[in-house]
Amino acid sequence: MADTSQKPDKATSAAQARQVIDVFHEISTLLNAELDRGTLSICISLIENGINPEALATVVRELKKDADEVRRQIAEGGVRNGE
């Protein structure tokens, strides 16, 4: 019979995962990174699966820059096709 006494149950694992995300979210907030818990969770999963953290950071910065530009264009009267 397998010894399951050392394996955390799903509820414990989920609680630990939430704690990790909460800590990363707090760090993100302190650094003004503006990353929500869902985004942080995705980033952590990508890094755990071998994505280069520096490359991921570059992509996140570029996406944020693009989103800011779209918001600026919308505020100025809308986004035009091809721009």
Swiss-Prot record:
Transmembrane segments: none annotated. GO terms for cellular component: cytoplasm; gamma-tubulin ring complex; interphase microtubule organizing center; mitotic spindle pole body; spindle. GO terms for biological process: gamma-tubulin complex localization; microtubule nucleation by interphase microtubule organizing center; mitotic spindle assembly. The keyword Cytoplasm applies. Its main location: cytoplasm. It is found in: Cytoplasm, Cytoskeleton, Microtubule organizing center, Spindle pole body. Keywords: Cytoplasm, Cytoskeleton. The keyword RNA-binding does not apply. Required for gamma-tubulin complex recruitment to the microtubule organizing center (MTOC). Part of the gamma-tubulin complex. Belongs to the MOZART1 family. This is Mitotic-spindle organizing protein 1. It comes from Botryotinia fuckeliana (strain B05.10) (Noble rot fungus).
